[in-house]
């Protein structure tokens, strides 16, 4: 899906949520820390969800 091509967005807030995003350069779902606000669709709560949607 097109959301898988969106860049990783940490966002300006300072919360600490462990999430996963699809890295289109490596073709893998990769963990990152999300700040809790803003961002885009390339932000998954689980590795399984990221892999399922982005077929990683």
Swiss-Prot record:
Disulfide bonds: 4-54, 13-37, 29-50
Protein name per Swiss-Prot or TrEMBL: PI-stichotoxin-Hcr2p
Function: This recombinant serine protease inhibitor inhibits trypsin (Ki=100 nM). It may also inhibit the TRPV1 receptor of the pain pathway. It possesses anti-inflammatory activity in vitro. It blocks histamine influence on intracellular calcium concentration in murine bone marrow-derived macrophages (84% inhibition at 10 uM and 67.2% at 1 uM), which can indicate inhibition of H1-histamine receptor (HRH1). In vitro, it shows cytoprotective activity in the oxidative stress agent 6-hydroxydopamine (6-OHDA)-induced neurotoxicity model.
Keyword Secreted assigned: yes
Any one cellular-component term (Gene Ontology): extracellular space
SUPFAM superfamilies attached to this UniProt entry: BPTI-like
InterPro entries in alphabetical order: Kunitz_BPTI, Kunitz_BPTI_sf, Prtase_inh_Kunz-CS, TFPI/VKTCI-like
Gene Ontology MF, one: serine-type endopeptidase inhibitor activity
Xref: Pfam families: Kunitz_BPTI
Site (May play a key role in exhibiting antihistamine activity): 17, 34
Site (Reactive bond for trypsin): 14-15
Tree of life domain: Eukaryota
Other noteworthy facts: Negative results: has no activity on Kv1.1/KCNA1, Kv1.2/KCNA2, Kv1.3/KCNA3, Kv1.4/KCNA4, Kv1.5/KCNA5, Kv1.6/KCNA6, Shaker, Kv11.1/KCNH2/ERG1 potassium channels and on TRPV1, the capsaicin receptors. A synonymy between H.magnifica and R.crispa is controversial.
């Amino acid at each position: 899906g097109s959301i898988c091509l969106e860049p990783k967005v940490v966002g300006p807030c300072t919360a600490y949520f462990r999430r996963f995003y699809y890295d289109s350069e490596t073709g893998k779902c990769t963990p990152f820390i999300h700040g809790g606000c803003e961002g885009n669709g390339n932000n998954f709560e689980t590795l399984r969800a990221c892999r399922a949607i982005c077929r990683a």
